[in-house]
Amino acid sequence: LIRTMPHLKRGDALCVYNTWAHTYVLDAMSMRAARLAPDSLRYRELKECARSQVKKLNELASAMGGWGYLTYSGFSKRPAAQPTSFLTGTVLISAWMAGKSFGLSLDDKIFTRALKFLKSQRTPAGTYVYSLSHSFYPGRPINRHTGSPDSRL
């Protein structure tokens, strides 16, 4: 991962699936670092790899706040992907882990927008809608918790 991640690119103009890869690699680097001495060579390599994943996640953040994996608005350096609650939550957890392991963090503005987006996607039932466009239909099956006791939600 340390050798190959610097070469990871978007698959095409539509898919921003690489966001998932940067997120999970950041998790892997953070988890592995927890068992290493901070002055070891491997820890420093992991930290550098993690730093590049955080940089990429900053670059891949949606201007709407959060992260998405599909963009229908054409190709741009900063994807115009519609953010999803589950990818945004996953990125924020990974960033938190990187903070604990390496002292790394997302850009403050990006973090604030992502957190604001995520909070806006929460329904009164405590679930999160799938994505921004689903905010208008919180009761649709895709937005409901499978075990929700009230099927009318």
Provide a role label for each language-model segment.
Residues 4-55, 59-112, 116, 120-153:
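An alpha-helical repeat/solenoid feature that recognizes helix-turn-helix modules
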